[in-house]
């Protein structure tokens, strides 16, 4: 499998979670920032200030929101503190001593934090000038922070404890690195990420919208965006047909009882939309309907609708099913975090003996999908059980068999993988695909889950060869994960430049004058009859402007038509991938376009 290649002119950036030194730098820098804020704004009250994967933040209770000018002043004060080379001192104190100190400086948020933490109670001091409750880790001195490798980035509102009913605070985000070069590379990537932001490109390319009357987290797909969705769905459906999957369709709502039996109501109720009941009595007895958060209980009902034999298995049911999660409004973000999304869901019902082969087939399908989407830099996370824990259901033998099937699949396919003991769900191990994009950000795409729980909860059975009734094993799988999230990631990965087979408009014909429009229209008709998505620019603009407009819309292929092309029955081709290709006969263009689309190639 392909590995991530970092070009010589870029700098590899360490991750906070993988670098103890970077964790200390960011944690200590957050304390330096809090000290600077309280020096400049004496009435500011501090709350929490952790490190993050890209930096750090601190939440403050202040009378007025911070401004850009405030951030500059805070940064300047931070540099002064760093240059004082203050020692960072860890102190362990009693809960009563901590309470007395906090009360003496009148910091109510710290008192609330104190009530929620376990002993030992630790305090970190910056010299003898500032302190905060903290578990660490930290640097030994502010001198260990490079003032040229830190930056304050933005301010946002945040509720205390994430509760909208509590005080609204001001959160300052910052970043800190080991060297100025790392900071510069991070800022370069961040700027590039803004250019690739799927929310920005989605609007510019006319792919999807959000509308206030509809509500947050509920995207509306335009014709162009719908084309991309449809192509992705059709592609996966064809791959599934080759592998013996059977299509099903299930409703968007169901009785609460279904999700009580599956366990979703007990475990995920806070993430589900409120129940719909026809009467107060139904509401009181929880007898109403809910929007489905998952598709699996529906597929189980289809399995249970008739007696199954071992000869019927494996049974592979597949659906592009829309599910609903009541995400908090502050957690929503473009297409990657929404309230209604479509999952390429499939549930395989297999005998224990079929688990290896079926799991391998599912992984092979996901690799086929990734190859077609040109997603090369990924690794597999094997989420296994912790052998010391007793939270898991199922026998040791069943778990070893399932984990062995996952391990053998990734090894046979020569995948880059790592094992994560203790990360399995209580009902079975799973395989997650972690994709690294062009900016070296990680996303989870595609998952395969072995499940012993739901067959037990729903009492699923099949008649074995010896006539006995046996329990099948379920495999949940979703190569895309969710269509919305996948498309958001693809927009950013491609920077809006979709490959020819996925592009909403594949070819735009540009006639240098209106007299050549009939010829252009005839070519479009030929292309459309072959299933190609083509259109004519009828704006009447000059050729240069038509080319610029097509480039802005990231049309993969432009075909210029003038007198010479009409006479030769040819097209002057320009592609985004290869530039100007010159005059090519129409028949050759059509053949090349068809072959490129069929092979998911570039031209």
Curated annotation (Swiss-Prot):
Its main location: cytoplasm. It comes from Synechocystis sp. (strain ATCC 27184 / PCC 6803 / Kazusa). Homodimer. This is Threonine--tRNA ligase. GO terms for biological process: threonyl-tRNA aminoacylation. It holds the Pfam family tRNA-synt_2b. Disulfide bonds: none annotated. The gene is thrS. Keywords: Aminoacyl-tRNA synthetase, ATP-binding, Cytoplasm, Ligase, Metal-binding, Nucleotide-binding, Protein biosynthesis, RNA-binding, tRNA-binding, Zinc. Gene3D superfamilies: 3.30.54.20, Anticodon-binding domain, Bira Bifunctional Protein, Domain 2, Threonyl-trna Synthetase, Chain A, domain 2. It catalyses: tRNA(Thr) + L-threonine + ATP = L-threonyl-tRNA(Thr) + AMP + diphosphate + H(+). Residues 197-499 are annotated as: Catalytic. Its EC number is 6.1.1.3. SMART domains: tRNA_SAD. Its cofactor is Zn(2+). It is found in: Cytoplasm.
